[in-house]
Amino acid sequence: MEFILPGALTGSCPAWPPDVFAVAATLMRRTGSYVRCLATGGKSAVSLLDERWPGRAEAIGGAWRRAICAALKEHAGSGKTSLESALLRATLPPSVTQAWSTLCNRAGTSFGSCTADDALTRSLLELSGYADEASWSIGLESAGDEQDEYGQAAQLFLALNDKQSFCHRVHPQRARVLGKKHTPQQGLTLRSLTHHLSLCMPWEVEPLWFDLDSARLDDVLNLLLLPWPLEVKATDFQCVNSGSGLSELRGDSLFEYSRPSRPDSEVERWVLDAIERAKRQVSKLHAVVLPELALTRSEWKIAEAVAIRSGVMLISGIIDDTDDKSGLPMNSCRIQMMSLPTRPGAETVAAAPPPAFRQAKHHRWCLDRHQVLQYDLGGQLPSALRCWENSHIGDRRIFFAHLGGWLTFSVLICEDLARQDPIADVLRSVGPNLVIALLMDGPQLAARWPARYASVLADDPGSSVLTLTSLGMCQRSRPVGGGGAGSRVIALWKDKLYGTRELELPEGCDACVLSLARDTREEYTADGRSDGKATEVTVYSGFFPVPAGSARNP
């Protein structure tokens, strides 16, 4: 306890619920004692929580939040020091302080004995539940809502923690607490215990949370999918020497995928033309999405400027990025989401170009003999060797963004969907209701690997998944035995309510609009608490191919 929250054993119960949750959840994760929320078997196995627990947790959590809001409203000014002083004045519900005292009194209990200690385990479950109920909508509400003192404080603490945690006294290097969209409805893990708070351990992956509730988002979300490049040449793949000789010692090879950057004027014309053609299919467009390795850095800047002028988000893989520290080549994606129009009454986007978020790929692509033959690359890459992408693996981060009051999304790059460690724990803890996977892959058929891994995320935590590849790679992908035309299934959609859909571009079309809608469902925590049918599920709502324009596209 002292490691997570210095001074925990000598002071009173922390007033800020995410701090209390960080302590309780970390201890439950370390000991596995969260399983005691259920009667799991045996002649005398009894749940530590009775049938009145859901209502009691909601009432006490609500009282805790009201106490904090009252203290902040009466005593807080602006800034961290003022908030600290106000939180110290909050009068916490007796049930919260009693559970905290029980926990502190048993601080000497060994990890191996925790689960068998009824009083200790009950206090952990209660503190977690109270903090979760007190933190409804954390990270999911506008920071500018003057009527929500709790939400304003949460946003300030998030900013002070560099977008890594909503905690106040718990340092992000000890435990991180973020918001949450989905609660797993199968299995029993620590993630099953909360609706609103997620524990992210400060290990390999750094999660970052952005709340853009001021952005205007309708109940229908229209994404323009640009499966660029439309043509991929075999000569775009080249063997390279790493300089270290490590790959050669293992009997492997390295390759890079590259192509010349296109003129600025052409890129601007292509993106503008695609947006204009898409708006003939739908009246409103919210985002433009391109696959892995779709744009160079210079092309991104032009496309980003067009997106900002057009009031749409832009998400794309970058082909020629480099690591800031080492200068080595890096496979990454960039996300510009500040370009969305703001809702009435919200602050407008600044006149200067807003910064885009960059996320690096966490795993390298490996082409084996089967894939070299499948993509007809045998004249460029040695099919007898494993060919690894020449890409630097540096700091691992994952980005979560909340938009428009209901959408929380994150982005993965190809192998990061399939090789889910070490990112899976963070992704499942937060449970975004949309995951966008940018791929450099063959056709997105329901029988192939992207669909399998999308199904895993749809099951736990319940995320909807979009996978998108380039038409060029689809066309290069052929059965190894020969024969068959290249596929035009450039994307795949999976949600937990309505299943899987392949998105195929008809001949004569070079883009499509995917329409998504918000559906609501009720989810329960493992300790029996309902969210009141407040869970928002992103579901398929339509698919509209965009006929090719007269301009020569990439």
Regions from the PLM with identified roles:
Residues 226-232, 238-287:
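N-terminal glycine-/serine-/threonine-rich phosphate-binding loop
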Residues 195-216, 328-429:
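Active-site catalytic loop in hydrolytic enzyme cores
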